[in-house]
């Protein structure tokens, strides 16, 4: 306990006080004889009577409420509400209005709001709720009188006390409390709780923190949030709702008093209540809520809050002023008693300069946090450190085994560590968990600062993440890998910590994020052969190399080597897997690597690149064809030695297929290296790409003796070369006198003129071979009857072509005549275009000498409109 308030006696006189109201340093007394008296109370000038109205009413003044901003005093006397003007002292409570509709009122409550309009104008809205018998009747103040809100609530009993906050009106009956939500079209009733669990007690309600209800139940003060009773889109339909403060999860638990409350006022941050034998001052925070007991005011009947730090208390004929002790004095006492929360609340409402106030609050938070940490309340301590916005490094210093290295410029230690408790086992784990939560918040704050690219923030973030790493290793190591991927941990300190805990996989992540790829790959190579290691095998190395990308190509080649030697098939996936990083590797350099060190993988690599990735690079196609050709040559050589070579047929088929289907290789370059004594069929494909038809046909006829392939080739190229069948016949009718290539004998069927084959081709393709061109090459002794079929087909074809040409000429001549006649008809069409004519497109008139277009349907448009329409049609 400490002294929060001092008591000053104001008046001891013969008037019988029936009600009391106050604002600022003014207090208004309502007497049993109907008098109104206003006093001004000042610490320096003392007590001064400002207004006095001896004959305001013939009946007692039972209740008063002041609206200081509007200089209005609402008075309840003779069961009716009246309004006075307290603006001018000389007026002595000038009467303004008496509300006849309030006749029968036993008590009332008010709601004052100052909404801001869209234009920025602030107006005061005053609403009054009167208890008239068993009804609540609502009014509003406008144009100096009370007007009906046309809202009436029927009650089950006569209310004893009322309190209005926003959309809710709380009613205290002799045995229970009820809240009415008046935000909807119809009032909604919500039952709260009984006034007492055992006997009937007078209800007591007070407004807490301007938006909460403080309600007395037995010896408790229950804080209720009225917003939970507001109907929102028909969701809250319950009529019996448990108060927030009665819920075990509420932050404001019921406040115990020495005896049931008789009266209560709220003076931030204290609840000041009148109990049986004294006035008690209590705080809503902390374990020990009792702040002060004022036994000398045990005879009081009334309490009223006037202003911040000022309360008036009254007995039947006495008046006291209760003033708050200066906050710095209270704060000093509270800090000595280690009541840090209350010290913070008091400092928040002090009149000290904002900067000084913020600094003081920060210091109290740090003291409170240190006290909580010493008491092993780690989670609460970290929350206080967070509120103090302390340097996270100073919090980390509370854990000596977590401090990575001294931080430059921190000789002035904010949080002393000498008195911190030694932590072991469960306490240490709880402390680590609390520290993790705190550092997670601190990390978010530092990341925001990093956007300003401040190096100090980067350094602090590094310390935070390194500390988090150590905490995770002690509490939940599954969080280590995600933390390392954020790439803010200190390399050397984290490396040492991970090695100490044998976290090899996490160490790889650290190296990877820090760009220490060589160290990571060395470690992977070492662990690959260790039995039982989490990194045993090749897969992790393969995946790591795949993710490096083209910027680290030398490193990929260096560490892919051992994988390729160990398992070529798996190792090849380093360069062929379906990953963006893999596909983007420079393929020419990868090819050079395979050619120089792993030649057996050149063909599989190029096949994947060309077949799967559809690479059309000429170099790659040329190299693959060269590899195919060289391998086929080696297999042929082995076959000549009598060895079995099952690979020969499929490999030669691959070579033939690629030469036939690929359009991306360079045929002239391939031809330079291609052998002339073997693979002549493949050579023919290359020559065909070079359009050397005579050479191709010579190979098919004179070397291979394959008339079918020669004929098929001629048919395939007939459209581009109409004389190709003439070339084919010449190959058959004029055999060469010597071999086409050294060491390659001529085919025996075509070393001499083969008349049968020649006649068969002539008869089959007669329409494609001109007799005038071929006759000079026919043997002189060839009988004419053998050529009869060929000549008949050929001549018929020529006659049909001539007849078709004649018919076409006739058709064209007739069409020309028709078009000339149609043109003449169009030229003979006349139309009138004058100043009244308008364009059918833009609806504007035609100006003199303007260009226009006339459509066949008779519509006439400007030339520019026609062009615009034509462009629009073209775009569609």
UniProtKB/Swiss-Prot annotation:
It is found in: Cytoplasm; Lysosome membrane; Late endosome membrane; Late endosome. CHCR repeats lie at residues 578-741. One of its GO terms (cellular component) is late endosome membrane. GO terms for molecular function: small GTPase binding. Disruption phenotype: RNAi-mediated knockdown causes impaired autophagosome clearance in fat body cells of starved or wandering 3rd instar (L3) larvae. Conditional RNAi mediated knock-down in muscle cells disrupts transverse-tubule (T-tubule) and myofibril remodeling in internal oblique muscles during metamorphosis. It is a peripheral membrane protein. GO terms for biological process: autophagosome maturation; autophagy; cellular response to starvation; endosomal vesicle fusion; intracellular protein transport; regulation of SNARE complex assembly; secretory granule-lysosome fusion; T-tubule organization. InterPro entries: Clathrin_H-chain/VPS_repeat, CNH_dom, Vam6/VPS39/TRAP1, VPS39/TGF_beta_rcpt-assoc_1, VPS39/TGFA1_Znf, WD40_repeat_dom_sf. Residues 14-310 form the CNH domain. It comes from the Eukaryota. Keywords: Autophagy, Cytoplasm, Endosome, Lysosome, Membrane, Protein transport, Transport. Belongs to the VAM6/VPS39 family. Part of the homotypic fusion and vacuole protein sorting (HOPS) complex, composed of Vps16A, car/Vps33A, dor/Vps18, Vps39, Vps11 and lt/Vps41. Interacts with Rab2 (GTP-bound form); the interaction is probably direct. Part of the homotypic fusion and vacuole protein sorting (HOPS) tethering complex involved in endo-lysosomal vesicle trafficking and lysosome biogenesis. The HOPS complex facilitates docking and fusion of lysosomes with late endosomes and several other types of vesicles. The HOPS complex is also involved in autophagy and crinophagy (the elimination of unused secretory granules through their fusion with lysosomes). This is Vacuolar protein sorting-associated protein 39 homolog.
């Amino acid at each position: 306990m400490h002294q929060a308030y001092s008591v000053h006696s104001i008046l001891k006189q013969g008037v019988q006080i029936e009600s009391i109201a106050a604002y600022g340093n003014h207090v208004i007394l309502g007497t049993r004889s109907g008098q109104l008296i206003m006093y001004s109370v000042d610490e320096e000038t003392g007590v001064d009577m400002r207004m006095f109205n001896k004959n305001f009413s013939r009946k007692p003044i039972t209740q008063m409420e002041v609206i200081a901003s509007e200089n209005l005093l609402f008075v309840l006397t003779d069961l009716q509400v009246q309004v006075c003007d307290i603006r001018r002292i000389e007026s002595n409570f000038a009467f303004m209005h008496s509300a006849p509709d309030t006749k029968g009122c036993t008590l009332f409550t008010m709601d004052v709001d100052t909404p801001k309009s869209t234009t920025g104008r602030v107006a005061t809205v005053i609403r009054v709720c009167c208890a008239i018998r068993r009804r609540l009747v609502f009014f509003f103040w406008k144009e100096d009188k009370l007007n009906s809100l046309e809202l009436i609530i029927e009650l089950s009993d006569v209310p004893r006390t009322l309190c209005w906050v926003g959309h809710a009106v709380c009613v205290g009956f002799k045995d229970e409390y009820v809240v009415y939500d008046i935000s909807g079209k119809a009032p909604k009733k919500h039952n709260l709780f009984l006034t007492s669990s055992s006997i009937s007690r007078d209800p007591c309600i007070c407004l807490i923190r301007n938006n909460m209800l403080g309600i007395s139940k037995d010896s408790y003060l229950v804080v209720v949030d009225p917003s939970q009773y507001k109907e929102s889109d028909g969701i809250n339909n319950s009529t019996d709702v448990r108060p927030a403060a009665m819920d075990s999860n509420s932050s404001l638990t019921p406040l115990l008093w020495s005896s049931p409350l008789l009266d209560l006022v709220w003076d931030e941050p204290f609840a000041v209540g009148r109990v049986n034998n004294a006035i008690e001052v209590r705080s809503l925070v902390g374990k020990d809520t009792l702040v002060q007991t004022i036994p000398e005011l045990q005879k009081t009947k009334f309490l009223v809050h006037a202003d911040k730090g000022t309360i008036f208390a009254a007995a039947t004929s006495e008046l006291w002023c209760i003033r708050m002790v200066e906050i710095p004095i209270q704060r000093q006492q509270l800090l000595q008693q280690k009541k840090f929360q209350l010290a913070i609340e008091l400092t928040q409402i002090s009149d000290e300069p904002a900067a000084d106030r913020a600094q003081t609050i920060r210091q109290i938070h740090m003291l409170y946090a240190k006290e909580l940490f010493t008491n092993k309340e780690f989670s609460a301590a970290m929350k206080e450190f967070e509120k103090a916005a302390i340097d996270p490094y100073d919090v980390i210093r509370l854990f000596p085994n977590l401090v990575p290295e001294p931080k430059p410029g921190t000789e002035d230690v904010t949080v002393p560590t000498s008195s911190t408790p030694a932590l072991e086992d469960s306490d240490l784990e709880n402390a680590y968990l609390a520290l993790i939560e705190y550092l997670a918040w601190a990390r978010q704050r530092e990341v925001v600062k990093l956007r300003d690219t401040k190096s100090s923030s980067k350094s602090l973030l590094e310390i935070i993440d390194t500390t988090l790493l150590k905490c995770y290793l002690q509490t939940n190591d599954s969080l280590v890998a995600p933390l390392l991927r954020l790439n803010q941990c200190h390399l050397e300190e984290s490396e040492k910590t991970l090695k100490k805990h044998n976290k090899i996989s996490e160490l790889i992540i650290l190296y990877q994020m820090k760009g220490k790829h060589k160290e990571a790959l060395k470690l992977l190579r070492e662990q690959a052969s260790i039995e039982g290691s989490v990194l045993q095998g090749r897969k992790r190395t393969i995946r790591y190399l795949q993710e490096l990308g083209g910027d680290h190509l030398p490193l990929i080649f260096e560490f892919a080597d051992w994988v390729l030697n160990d398992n070529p098939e798996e190792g090849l996936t380093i360069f062929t897997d379906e990953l963006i990083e893999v596909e983007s590797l420079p393929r020419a350099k990868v090819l050079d690597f395979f050619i120089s060190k792993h030649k057996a993988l050149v063909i599989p690599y190029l096949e994947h690149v060309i077949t799967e990735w559809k690479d059309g690079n000429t170099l790659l196609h040329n190299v693959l064809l060269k590899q195919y050709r060289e391998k086929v040559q080696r297999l042929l050589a082995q076959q000549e030695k009598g060895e079995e070579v099952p690979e020969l047929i499929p490999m030669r088929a691959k070579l033939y297929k690629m030469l036939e289907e690929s359009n991306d290789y360079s045929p002239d370059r391939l031809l330079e290296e291609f052998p002339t004594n073997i693979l002549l069929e493949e050579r023919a494909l290359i020559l065909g790409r070079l359009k050397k038809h005579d050479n191709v046909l010579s190979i098919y006829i004179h070397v291979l003796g394959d008339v079918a392939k020669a004929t098929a080739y001629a048919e395939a190229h007939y459209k581009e070369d109409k004389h190709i069948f003439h070339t084919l016949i010449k190959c058959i009718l004029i055999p060469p006198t010597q071999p086409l290539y050294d060491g390659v004998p001529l085919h025996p069927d075509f070393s001499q003129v083969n008349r049968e084959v020649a006649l068969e081709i002539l008869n089959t393709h007669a329409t494609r071979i001109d007799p005038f061109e071929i006759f000079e090459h026919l043997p002189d002794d060839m009988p004419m009857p053998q050529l009869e079929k060929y000549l008949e087909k050929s001549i018929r074809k020529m006659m049909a072509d001539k007849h078709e040409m004649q018919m076409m000429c006739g058709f064209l001549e007739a069409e020309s005549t028709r078009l000339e006649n149609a043109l003449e008809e169009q030229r003979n069409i006349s139309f009138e275009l004058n100043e009244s004519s308008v364009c059918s497109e833009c609806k504007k008139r035609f100006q003199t000498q303007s260009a226009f277009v006339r459509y066949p349907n008779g519509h006439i448009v400007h030339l520019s409109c026609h062009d615009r329409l034509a462009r629009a049609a073209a775009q569609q």
